[in-house]
Amino acid sequence: MLDQKELLCLLQLASPILPVGAYSYSEGLETLVEKGIISNSASLNDWLERSLCQGSIRLETAVLLRVYRCFCQEDFTKLNYWDNWLSATRETAELRQQSWQMGRSLLNLLRELAPARDNLPEQANYATAFAIGASHWQIGEELAVLGYLHSWASNLINAGLRLIPLGQTLGQSLLIGLQPSLLTATADIISLADENLSSWSWGLSFASMNHETQYSRLFRS
C-alpha cells in the first residue's frame, strides 16, 4: 500500500506550483507550433508519445534514477559524474540553461525546506535536484520516475494550451490519455542498463536551435 506521507511528498515535488520556473519553458514546442508541425491536440499528443518512447526526457529520467541511487548510497563522486554526463547530453544552450536554472532553483528550495542537509551541491541539473529531493523525502525510485515524467508532460501540455491554443478540458483529456505511456516509460527506464542509455531527439534539438533566433517568443526554450 502506498504510504500517505510518501504520496504527499511526491505531490509536492511534482507540483506545478513548485517555484522552479517550469512554466516559462516549452522545450522547443513554441517553434514547432509556429512552423505548423504541431497544430492541434493530436499532433501534440503524438509529439509527447514519441518523446516518452525515444526522446531526451527518457534519457534524462534514466539519469535521474541513477542520481537517486547515488544519493541514497552517499556516493557523491558518481553522482557528480552522472550530473556532468547529463549536462553533456544537452544539445543546445537553451536546453542546458533550462536544466541548470531549474536545478539551481530546486536546490535552493531544498536548502530552505531541509536546512539540516549539508551535502547538497551548489549547482546541478533539474533531474539531479529532483532525484535528491525524492531521496531526501524517501519517495520510492519508481514513484520518483513516474512523478518526474508526469510533471514534464503536464508542463508541456500547459504550454500547448497557450500556444496552439487548446481548451483546458482537452488538455486534461490529453494528460489522462498519456497515462499508459507514462507507466510504460517508467517501467522501461527502471530496467534500462547503462550501456543502453540513448535518445533519438534530433527534432527537439533543431526546434530548440531555431527557437534561439525566433522573432517573437513567449517561452525561454
Swiss-Prot record:
Major place of residence: cytoplasm
Keyword Cell membrane: no
Record carries keyword Cytoplasm: yes
GO molecular function terms listed in the Swiss-Prot or TrEMBL record: nickel cation binding
Protein location: Cytoplasm
Assembly with partners or alone: UreD, UreF and UreG form a complex that acts as a GTP-hydrolysis-dependent molecular chaperone, activating the urease apoprotein by helping to assemble the nickel containing metallocenter of UreC. The UreE protein probably delivers the nickel.
Role summary: Required for maturation of urease via the functional incorporation of the urease nickel metallocenter.
HAMAP family per record: UreF
Stated name of the protein: Urease accessory protein UreF
Native source organism of the sequence: Microcystis aeruginosa (strain NIES-843 / IAM M-2473)
Lineage: Bacteria, Bacillati, Cyanobacteriota, Cyanophyceae, Oscillatoriophycideae
Gene name linked to the record: ureF
